[in-house]
């Protein structure tokens, strides 16, 4: 689907990482396939979530530390990082009752019990991933002065205002990643080379002219 802008699209969403497995080999395979199918001058995208699927942080059980590894991968890999709103503060799914859902899909799923849906991996309503952005701890979390049709998600303590004051927060981490990416040509424009795994470590180089950035990502539960 990619082309030079005259015969195809300049950029496409790649959903290969939507249902990711949290391990080095899974992401090494994605990066290698990106280089095979979207080699320079084309650009891949690295997308973890969107408005049609459960919030991606749920795949690591809401772990902020694991999500930081994924964010570092997203902003250091070659291509365009795409974040779904709220990922930068670790927002989790809501718990919208099917009877109260606005999503048309919920009406088709209204006879499926929740416990059975969880067992089968069925997403009863997309409203769960479309809850209001959590700006602060004021009423409706600063999203609106009126009552929104979806309730706040199940992690109401994760707000922009709260994380802005915390130098170790996920939001601060995202801002640091953006600043580093912006200030190094190797990270925002460089080629991707030497993609490999060593146990639970994923590593690759980003190279632009004489500048090289070596990236190492630890997917294990042991600090390296």
Tell where the protein language model's regions lie, with residue ranges.
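Active-site-adjacent loop/helix micro-motif of nuclease/hydrolase catalytic cores
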Residues: 26
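Loop/helix patches that line or flank the sugar-binding groove of alpha-linked glycan CAZymes
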Residues: 2-3, 8-12, 22, 30-33, ...
């Amino acid at each position: 689907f990619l082309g030079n802008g005259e015969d195809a699209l300049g950029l496409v969403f790649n959903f290969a990482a939507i249902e990711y497995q949290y391990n080095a080999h899974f992401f090494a395979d994605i990066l290698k396939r990106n280089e095979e199918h979207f080699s320079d001058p084309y650009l891949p995208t690295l997308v973890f979530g969107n408005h049609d699927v459960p919030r991606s942080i749920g795949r690591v059980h809401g772990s902020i530390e694991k999500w930081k590894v994924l964010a570092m991968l997203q902003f250091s890999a070659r291509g365009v990082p795409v974040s779904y709103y709220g990922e930068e503060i670790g927002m989790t799914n809501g718990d919208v009752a099917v009877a109260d859902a606005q999503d048309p899909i919920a009406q088709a799923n209204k006879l499926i019990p929740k416990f059975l849906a969880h067992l089968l991996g069925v997403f009863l309503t997309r409203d769960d991933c479309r809850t209001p952005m959590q700006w602060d701890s004021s009423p409706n979390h600063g999203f609106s002065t009126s009552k929104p049709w979806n309730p706040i998600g199940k992690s109401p303590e994760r707000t922009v205002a709260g994380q802005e004051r915390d130098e170790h927060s996920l939001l601060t981490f995202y801002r640091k990643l953006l600043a580093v990416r912006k200030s190094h040509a190797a990270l925002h424009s460089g080629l991707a080379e030497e993609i490999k795994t060593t146990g639970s470590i994923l590593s690759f180089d980003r190279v632009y002219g004489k500048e090289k950035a070596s990236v190492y990502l630890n997917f294990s539960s042991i600090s390296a």
